[in-house]
Amino acid sequence: MNLSLINPFRLSHLTVPLWFFVFVPYKLGEALLITLLPLFIVQTVNGSVTDVGRVHSLTSLAGVIAFIVWGNLSDRLKLRRPFLILGFCGFALCTALTAIAQGIEQVMIFCTLGAFFMAAITPVASALVIDGNPEDRWASAFGRFYQISGWSFVGGVLLGASWLAFIPIHWTSMGLRSLLLLASCAATVSLILCWKWVKEPRKSSEHRHYQPELQDVISVAVIERRAMFYSSRMLYFILHPSWRVNLLHNLSRPLLLYYACAAVFFFAVNVVFVPFPIFLTTHLGATNTQVLLITMGKAAIEAFFYLPMARFVQKRKGVQLQAWATAIRVAVFLIFSLVAVMPVHPLSLPLVGMAHLLTGLTWAAISISSTTIVATLAPKGQEAIAMGSYNSLIGIATIIGSLVGGMMAVSYGYSACFITGAILMGVTATRLFWIGRMPNLILQKQGNPIK
């Protein structure tokens, strides 16, 4: 069964498979868990910012490992539905256990297990999109799926903010626990819908091939906060055992330089944003509702600009676009640093909130252009391997950056995190501008300049 929708960006009717909407309740729950977890750790189980970093690091590690395990297993067995059911069940159970956890150790265990099962959902959903559509429709199908997922995430954050706004202050801990239980219930709804609406595809592809049409629509993640929480992104291929050998034999200098820039970028992002929600509440005195509204504003911008940015990237040089987007983040992180070192003013929180919205716009540019850049810099025939390696690199940078961000905030203060992020973003932007000016012969593949 399909539904006819109107795409707000092209004002044309689209036919959307009903099973796409199986993920809407799950994405609502995922948004609640990801955005509330730092607050829950500090305010409910009396953890520290360091603990927030440790939990982020463990969930990312679990996601990196499980993403490869579940994706390969699903392709080998040529089964999709059982892995979705496993993912929804695991998320629902582990989130419910997190909601009733009594200490940081329990939160770490349940969140790590939850991330391991959550990672089953992403590659299998990707496989379903591929299995259910001809190759010439993959790009549009992924674009629609991403849109639905992104706006569902925004809806989840809005739901959390609305709930907390009506709860008395002295019920904050109970409110956070109830929202995590709601997230568990939402995943259970997805489980039921999956059982009813998702059918095994008639054809299941064991090997997924790179399609150039996809590089301008597949991103790291529509929502940056989701990309930070765990690093299993929507990939349309699975790495096979020979990928490391093939990559080492075909590495190009520009691709190596871009990998280095990406590693520094995602390390810096986590150093800044892992302690960011706690900075808002403890230093600026923001309420939990205000924290969620700030998060929602950024997520809404990311979801809104996803498809327009994909079309924009097709007509521009991806390296230059990402360099400018990264440079904007230098200014944003410097604003965060300035607010952190100065006495708190009534305008401090609005200023940080407005600056945070800019990072949403830059993420739309960065996440889309990064896939295009990697695919273009990779040797011909090695694009899928290059992007798989890029995804692994993001995971490693996230794991380390989360740990460092939490420890740095406790040891040296939030300003140290923000200044470090600004410096590293500045270095990254400089190197990206330099890569963009490299001779065309280096940046060309089969006579086509980098986009």
Predicted features by range, described:
Residues 1-13, 200-259, 450-451:
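Juxtamembrane intracellular "pre-TM" segments in multi-pass secondary transporters
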